[in-house]
């Protein structure tokens, strides 16, 4: 298949509307992220019960993310995205009507949990389309744009819009509005990606061979040591993102006196920053080296900014301006992990779909483990215990990075050597 090289600052123009679809869909999916845990608590459930709902959701998302890369290669990214789209809409309605609508915890868990299967199928399948439609030496910047539009959706619009709608139509009205955004994003993807090409060799495999390829998404973890270490680093990458969304509303709103709208605007500032930092680090990593950016700016930056996200608000109290400082810092450094999405397929060039599935599984496990750590530590060590745990794990990732041996397109096997010619790097 041919690769379209038309780009704008690393954005592949042939996939432009796919990027827009991701932004719109994830806007709807992101509405709940920064207020749902507090809303579930307001319905009469404990903080641990609210966190457990997110933990179950994260587990479902991890399982779905694990298979999404291989499934997207076998049945095409578009079909996989459509399965995720329909699943999201159906179980979101069930979650609102029978779960939250009746404050029924026994129904909140299964409907919200099953809905967790949906967004990874829609979101991560698009990574397969990117990997197969851009040159490998340009994949870091293309994936930077992917995470940028993800941030536009789930973080910026997903946080700012609820901060204005909740005072007028309430939490439930805002959650119903989310359905409109997700439906629009799904329709945009359906229309715009009908002719997006992906290699067809996986689609012609026998059923047995397809299951074998699906299994490879797990076996790579012990057959390729660099994949294993990369997976651990990717899991650690977004612990603060998913964990702070669960624990920080309780600290900011219940303890420090912020309104829900103020907290949502602080959280949106974090995501707004990542729009630019995702693109920035994607481009920088192609010049400086993937692992160098991940290790020194991602791991160290996130360790420090995670601590700041707790200590600065605790010191200054209900001070909106000072609360923005650690939020912006967190947004700058979490994006330094963007090259991880390019590292995985580079480690397994003959099984890119399986490698991407491991990457997606790792992202999903991060979604699962972040609130799980909170569930375990909150009753004993409060918010600070959770923050310190996340910080320690970022330091662990710093020491794991040198163990990942990846040959970056555009570089010789020595990552510190000068880039060789672009022609030699093309896939």
Predicted regions and their residues:
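Cytoplasmic helix-loop-helix junction between adjacent transmembrane helices
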Residues: 111-149
């Amino acid at each position: 298949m041919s690769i379209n090289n038309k780009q704008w600052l690393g954005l592949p123009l042939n996939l432009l509307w796919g990027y827009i679809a991701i932004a719109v869909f994830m806007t709807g999916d992101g509405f709940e992220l920064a207020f749902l845990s507090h809303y579930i608590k307001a319905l009469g459930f404990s903080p641990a019960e609210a966190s457990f709902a997110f933990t179950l959701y994260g587990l479902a998302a991890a399982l779905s993310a694990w298979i999404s890369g291989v499934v997207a290669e076998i049945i095409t990214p578009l079909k996989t995205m459509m399965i995720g789209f329909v699943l999201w809409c159906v179980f979101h309605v069930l979650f609102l009507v029978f779960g939250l609508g009746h404050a029924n915890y026994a129904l909140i868990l299964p409907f919200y949990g099953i809905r967790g299967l949906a967004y990874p199928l829609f979101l991560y399948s698009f990574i397969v389309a990117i990997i197969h439609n851009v040159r490998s030496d340009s994949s870091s910047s293309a994936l930077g744009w992917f995470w940028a539009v993800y941030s536009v959706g789930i973080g910026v619009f997903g946080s700012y819009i609820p901060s204005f709608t909740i005072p007028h139509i309430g939490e439930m009205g805002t959650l119903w509005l989310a359905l409109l955004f997700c439906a629009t994003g799904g329709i945009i993807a359906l229309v715009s990606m009908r002719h997006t090409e992906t290699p067809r060799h996986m689609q012609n495999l026998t059923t047995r061979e397809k299951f074998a390829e699906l299994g490879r998404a797990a076996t790579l973890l012990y057959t390729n040591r660099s994949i294993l270490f990369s997976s651990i680093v990717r899991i650690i990458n977004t612990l603060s993102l998913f964990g702070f969304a669960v624990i920080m509303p309780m600290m900011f709103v219940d303890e420090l006196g912020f309104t829900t709208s103020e907290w949502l605007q602080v959280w949106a500032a974090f995501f707004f920053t990542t729009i630019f930092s995702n693109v920035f680090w994607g481009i920088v990593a192609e010049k400086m080296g993937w692992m160098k950016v991940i290790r020194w700016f991602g791991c160290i930056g996130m360790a420090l900014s995670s601590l700041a996200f707790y200590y600065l608000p605790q010191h200054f109290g209900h001070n909106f301006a000072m609360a923005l400082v650690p939020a912006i810092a967190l947004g700058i450094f979490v994006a330094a992990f963007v090259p991880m999405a390019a590292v995985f397929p580079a480690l397994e060039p003959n099984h890119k779909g399986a490698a991407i599935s491991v990457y997606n599984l790792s992202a999903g496990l991060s979604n699962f483990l972040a609130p799980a750590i909170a569930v375990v530590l909150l009753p004993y060590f409060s918010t600070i215990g959770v923050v310190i745990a996340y910080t320690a794990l970022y330091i662990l990732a710093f020491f794991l990075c040198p163990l990942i041996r990846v040959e970056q397109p555009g570089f010789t096997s020595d990552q510190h050597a000068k880039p060789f010619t672009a022609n030699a790097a093309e896939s």
